[in-house]
Amino acid sequence: MNAILKENIKDKASKVFAMNPKDAVLAKSYMAVSFASLLIGGLLGLLQGLNRAGVLQLPSWFNYYQVLTAHGLILILVMTAFFTIGYFYSAMSNDFGGLLPKVRKMGWVAYGLKIFGFVMTVIPILLNKASVLFTFYPPMAASPWFYIGLVFIVVGVWVAAFGAFIQVATWRKQNKGQHVPIMSYFGTGVFVLLFFSSIPVAIEVFMIIPWAFGWIETINVMLARTLFWAFGHTLVNIWYLTATSAWYVVIPKLMGGKRWSDTLTRVVIISLVVMNITGGFHHQIVDPGISEAVKYMHVFMSLAIGFPSLMTAYALFATFEKTARRNGGKGLVGWYKKMPWKDVRFLAPFIAMVAFIPAGAGGIVQSTNQLNQVVHNTMWVAGHFHLTLGMTVIMTFFGVSYWLIPYISGRALTPTINKIGLVQTWVWTIGMTTMAFAMHAVGLLGSPRRTSYSTYGDHATALGWDPYLALLAIGGTLLIVGVILQVYAVVNMMFFAPKGLTEFPVADVEEDASRTPYWTERWGIWIIAMLLLVAMAYVIPITEFIVNAPPGSPPYKTW
């Protein structure tokens, strides 16, 4: 490991490139916000866990539902989004020898819009005027300024997305007939999904604003919920697609191997983009007013995403085995010993991949009509969400940070920070596994989600939840230790680590891999296919919600 960390930069000069300084400042700004958000959101998560276990009574001026709303908003809309944009803008800078000046400017505009929007949403939460949780659909109503803040966040996403589109389109004009570099290809897929999935939630927010101001008396709840989940469902898979970019492209390079198949990688990206938005109704299986036929169609569309996930599992473990055997691995399973377990850049994403096995299985459970009836409004769902986001996605982001932060900062990963990263990885793994297990188990026993601690009049069933909730609090406490270690490592790598050139690791394709067909570059076709599937999934039910609208709801404030 020390040899890897102390490799002679001069001997690798042809493979290592310093990042454009102006692009580096932009990327560091995004990463700084991302990990500051992790610290704040993590502290709020600890308060939730301790309160939910009955250990901590929160004051009336900062209650559980304020904390829950802020925790979700900060980690879901801020931490992940800033990381994703900073990550892919760094990748495009690396792929294309620097960002175009206008694209860099658009990156800064997006940054400013998102920061402004974030501040506008947080202030009403702190004033206890927006405790509507991350799932901010009606009938609960926040301050209208909360929703106006969301508009700025969405517009910021659009600006960042179009910046990426301009960068890729310009390169393609100058390099006709060539394939877009694989990391930028992943980025294109992610930004396509971000743009199109945010359109429904933008429509929802513009429905809510006049209702929240009191200009109209009621709102169509079913329509608003459906528009939200067209976005919310896709957002989870945007994180997943971002994580898989590191799995496919970076991890093989860190192992000293190569990508198994460029064609398969691009087909997986296309599949995830085309099939993603259409599964929103599987979050609404228990909702009235939606026909069983529509629900089953969306369940099928949700389960279809499992196909590219299985392709990913096959490709990655084929890469692992092939590389490990090249490095001297022997036997049926003995080759695992040749994998770089002491390199945090590999270990954290690998554990994240393994965590996706139970996380994905839980998603299948929640897409199944009968099983969903049992777990839908229980802590099981929170456990599933923390496995998918907290383990699969965030741990991949952590692993990425140990080479990305040095790359954009012009510094080196030291053996000391690598060791801290290994400790952080295991602390986080144990903490999140403990908490997620407790959430799943107590959910099966009937403990509801989205509620503060209560014994429900010392009811025997509720008292039976306490051991699991205590386990939840223990897991949450370990997680905040992991957060502090991670933020410390990021600050060190960004400002205090020794100066040096760190490579943006991009694995080459195997020499004997088949040539990638150019139809994978026909993004116009894939976007049309995506829109056709979206139309199949949503036109009929949304028309039904509008033409045969249920009674509208006035705004409710339940806190």
At which residue positions do the language-model features occur?
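Non-transmembrane, amphipathic alpha-helical segments
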Residues: A18-P21, V25-K28
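Acidic/aromatic-lined carbohydrate-recognition and catalytic surfaces
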Residues: P139-M140, W145
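Short, membrane-interfacial amphipathic segments enriched in basic
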Residues: I216-E217
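Hydrophobic cores of alpha-helical transmembrane segments in multi-pass integral membrane proteins
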Residues: A3-A13, L26-A53, F62-L99, R104-S131, ...
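Membrane-interfacial, low-structure loops and terminal tails that flank and connect transmembrane helices
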Residues: I4-N20, K173-G177, T323-K342, L413-P415, ...
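Membrane-interface helix termini and inter-helical loops of multi-pass transporters
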Residues: Q57-L58, L133-F136, D287-S291, Q373-H376
